Design a protein with these regions (language model features):
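Intrinsically disordered, low-complexity repeat and linker tracts
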Residues: 23-31, 446-459, 480, 525-578
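Aromatic-rich carbohydrate-binding modules that target alpha-glucans
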Residues: 45, 53-147, 157-190
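N-terminal cap/lid segment of alpha/beta-hydrolase-fold proteins
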Residues: 61-62, 133, 182-237
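Surface-exposed, short loops/turns at beta-strand junctions within beta-sandwich domains
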Residues: 144-148, 505-514
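Short beta-strand element of the alpha/beta-hydrolase
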Residues: 229, 240-252
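Cap/lid segment of the alpha/beta-hydrolase catalytic domain
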Residues: 251-318
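Primarily recognizes the serine-hydrolase "nucleophile elbow" in alpha/beta-hydrolase
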Residues: 317, 324-375
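C-terminal catalytic histidine-bearing segment of alpha/beta-hydrolase fold enzymes
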Residues: 384, 389-448
Length: 583
């Protein structure tokens, strides 16, 4: 009788715990998440696959908040309408822009609007202001959006009539703690590489094989301390002689933007992981440290001299990079593209590759000397702009790029690529351009497919080790990946001048039965194979209370005896708690 009472008591405890778990789960259903929440589009508005709900707490934005509106990269253009503006040499002031609620397949975001003629919208500068719904201290709005990266901020109006744009207090851009620079806007990613807009499939953060990003300082040409952003690829400590990409921001920008709003680190992460790019370091410049507008010739000469005489020596002294100019690239957007053209003009010997994005060039027949032409014939040049980029359709760009530089490069047989991206003078264009530059232009190095010389497509049992021999030089080995997951270096051995990898049985036992994909990553290539794990035949049939369970000979875990009320109560508690946890 006493055992029955104990059993009933334990069941009661289980029931109480289950109810409490249920109450906790239900209480969270109605919780409001500040920041952004991304789900499938159920608004019935637009053809976008996703919807994003923005929620901000006005008490975190100061006192006497009168109203909050959303602004950011939520203006779109129809791709079918872009050619007219290009062909007619029109300013993008005349282009029709569409809101997020009007999105259709084939549209793409273009940063800010070129005009504010549509009176159904409110604007702050060139950005549509999306009204938010107030509920006590919370403001919210939901936008249907296609898959890409977006920047945004909140336009806050106060009771005294003043207004300011602020970042999301729960999702600010990452700050450089050395000088307090940040990317000015909050940002987020929608969707994934499989459904991203054209040119954006490499921008998404990885969940493995990721590089790191940090900030450093150097002494500039004028004796002052200036900041650099430094991206280091995954496995940096294992390699040497890394190639280097120097990136310049646009007018008013700084060293934080390229790897946040521009996703440059993510793009390189993905390209390296997929064998599309040799291991490379990125150095993001802070050209706003120097005086000048960014379009002034004297200022750009200073920038060029500073990167050659100060930045490159600092990087080569403190980081494991190649000192060969053919392993360096310089690219920039907008004003940074102007800087890139100046670097190409006065320091062509210092780089092997130049990227001029959304920028006119300060170059003419007087500058394009026979000496410069001779030096550029061993370089690669990439030029790009957006479909409705004022850097493409304004008269300055047309005269300097379309009418002068491209014909000149053709005439002198200089290797160049000119590409138009979907977008305006904005990050959608610049991310797409950088992806092409890194993936298709850089390094003149095709990805090397190394061979598995022994151990390819092998069948092994769970209790066995796996030995793989390759033709990869040991000095080039970087990492081992199984099923898209990097394997901890301490869990396998690497030996030989041409590497042999041994996966011990302890590692094999952690993998599931069936086929697996193994990839050995080298500095400039990879080797890959499949292997198959079959079940260990050394198993026991264990009979306990008329129940048969199959267990390894090394371990045998039995279910509790069901005729023991005490153990049954504990078992019931375990099952119910497991179910509650799932709820």
């Amino acid at each position: 009788m006493r055992q029955v009472k104990r059993w009933i008591l334990q069941i009661g405890i289980c029931f109480t715990l289950l109810l409490s778990l249920g109450v906790y789960s239900m209480s969270n259903v109605h919780a409001v998440n500040e920041g952004i929440t991304i789900t499938d589009n159920t608004t019935g508005l637009s053809e976008a696959k996703y919807q994003v709900t923005f929620v901000v707490d006005s008490t975190k934005l100061g006192e006497n908040v009168e109203n909050i509106q959303l602004q950011g990269g939520f203006q779109f253009i129809k791709s079918s309408e872009a050619p007219w503006y290009q062909e007619n040499g029109a300013s993008n002031d005349g282009i029709r822009w569409y809101s997020a609620y009007e999105y259709e397949q084939g549209m793409y975001p273009t940063g800010g609007c070129g005009n504010t003629e549509r009176t159904e919208f409110n604007y702050n500068g060139n950005y549509i202001l999306y009204d938010m719904v107030k509920d006590e201290n919370l403001y919210s709005v939901t936008l249907p959006l296609p898959a890409t990266e977006y920047f945004y901020g909140y336009f806050v109006t106060y009771s005294d009539g003043s207004a300011v744009v602020v970042q999301d207090p729960v999702n600010p851009s990452k700050k450089n703690e050395i000088n307090n620079h940040d990317a000015t806007w909050s940002y987020f990613y929608v969707g994934n590489s499989s459904d991203a807009l054209a040119g954006q499939s490499y921008i998404y953060p990885r969940n493995n094989n990721m590089g790191s990003y940090q900030y450093d300082t150097y002494i500039a040409y004028d004796g002052t301390e200036n900041c650099l952003g430094i991206y280091l690829p995954n496995g940096y400590s294992l390699g040497n002689n890394y190639k280097t990409i120097y990136l310049a921001h646009g007018n008013g920008g700084n060293e934080t933007e390229w790897c946040q709003l521009g996703s440059a680190g993510n793009i390189v992460d993905n390209l390296i992981a997929e064998g599309e790019l040799a291991d490379s370091i990125i150095v993001t410049l802070n050209n706003s440290h120097f005086s000048g507008t960014g379009f002034d010739i004297k200022s750009n000469v200073i920038l060029a001299q500073d990167v050659v005489n100060n930045v490159i020596p600092f990087i080569e002294k403190n980081y494991k990079v190649s000192t060969d100019p053919k392993d360096r690239a310089y690219a920039g957007l907008s004003a940074g593209g102007v800087a890139a053209s100046t670097v190409m003009e006065i320091a062509p010997d210092s780089f092997g590759y130049f990227g001029i994005i959304s920028a006119a060039v300060q170059i003419d027949d007087e500058v394009f000397t026979d000496e410069l032409i001779s030096k550029l014939q061993t370089k690669k040049i990439y030029l790009s702009a957006g479909t409705v980029d004022f850097g493409l359709i304004n008269s300055f760009f047309k005269a300097s790029i379309l009418d002068f530089m491209l014909p000149k490069l053709d005439a002198e047989n200089i290797d160049y690529t000119f590409e138009i991206q979907n977008g305006g003078h904005d990050w959608n264009t610049w991310r797409g351009a950088f992806t092409t530059f890194a993936k298709d232009i850089l390094w003149n190095q095709e990805n090397i497919e190394y061979c598995i010389t022994d151990g390819a497509n092998k069948n092994i049992k769970q209790g066995e080790e796996l030995k793989i021999k390759t033709d990869i030089p040991s000095s080039l080995f970087k990492m081992l990946i199984i099923d898209d997951q990097e394997i901890d270096r301490s869990k396998y051995t690497v030996s030989g001048d041409l590497i042999t990898i041994i996966l011990p049985k302890e590692l094999i036992s952690t993998l599931t039965i069936g086929e697996h994909i193994l990839v050995i990553i080298a500095n400039e290539g990879q080797a890959a194979t499949m292997f198959n794990i079959t079940a260990d035949t050394n198993v026991l049939d264990i009979v306990e209370n008329d129940q048969i369970t199959k267990q390894s000979a090394h371990t045998a875990v039995l279910a509790p005896k069901t005729d023991d009320p005490s153990l049954f109560g504990v078992y019931c508690l375990f099952i119910l708690l497991s179910g509650g946890a799932i709820v």
